Amino acid sequence: MASYILRRILVTIPVMAIVALFVFSLLYIAPGDPAAVIAGDQASPADVERIRQSLGLDRPFLVQFGTWLWRILHFDLGNSIFTNLPVTSMIVQRIEPTLSLMLLTLVLTLVVAVPLGVVAAWKAGSLIDRAIMAFAVSAFSLPVFVVGYVLAYVFALELEWAPVQGYTPIAEGFWPWLQSLILPSIALGCVHIALIARITRASMLEVLQQDYIRTGRAKGLGQRSILFVHALKNAAVPIVTVIGIGVALLIGGAVVTESVFAIPGLGRLTVDAILRRDYPVIQGVVLMFSFLYTLVNLLVDLTYTIIDPRIRY
């Protein structure tokens, strides 16, 4: 196991290097000149050129990339073009709402989706199964922002059960924190609940047809023990795989959700940076999300060996 973990970490190094190259290339792929954006519309060509030199944009591409990568290795993501604040500190200030939203959404998804998928497989072909699958198809088809606006209107504006917008840090209390995130988590989690419920149902149906399940039933094992102890454990590998892939969807969905509910997280920071063409901030956030997704994939691979002892590396 230790050798496998070491190999996986070594594999992530070239992956992150390629990601870093792509992120840095955004400066050249994106339209517009960062120096001209900083200088403003009234600046002369000489002013723009002076800013280019101060930013090092007049140097060769590989030299700029090497300098930028060296700073990254020292946790220096540069400064924002507009606020002149360190990008690292901006990310640290905004990361709590985003991670809180993603973690709460993930917990909500697992608590709801896995039991729904298990029940749908247990009652395959019944009215309950069809109702769950109809809900899954409907939830999967709805955009995050549509669900968000509907939830905000019904439960925040009309019923006043939760705040419409904003975020309350968990340091100010668990209940206010939960109230500020419950509607965004439901809006963001609908697609993931639908996806994981369908995958759980399909995986459980395959496992429930195996001989050892029939043997357990013949020996008098209870239905709950068969479903949640024996069948679910052996059906968990595809579910964990989809959960790992779903982290990328969570990252993308968090950007939209934070915009709908005015949550001051990394999603809002990214949108504001894109609108202002604040390239250092965009690069820093994308690089951080890429590292997070790579780490999640590593954890998913390690989880395989825990839930299925037959998998060895």
Task: Please name every model-derived segment.
Residues 2-4, 92-129, 144, 157, ...:
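Alpha-helical transmembrane segments of integral membrane proteins
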Residues 3, 7, 63, 67-71, ...:
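Short hydrophobic helices that act as membrane-entry/anchoring signals
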Residues 6-16:
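N-terminal signal-anchor/signal peptide hydrophobic helix marking the start
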Residues 12, 20, 42, 110, ...:
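Residue-level recognition of pore/gate-forming positions within transmembrane alpha-helices
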Residues 17-22, 103-107, 150-151, 287:
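Hydrophobic alpha-helical transmembrane segments of multi-pass integral membrane proteins
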Residues 22-29, 59, 67-70, 134-165, ...:
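Membrane-water interface segments at the C-terminal ends of transmembrane alpha-helices
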Residues 58-114:
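An internal, D/E-rich "acidic patch" concept
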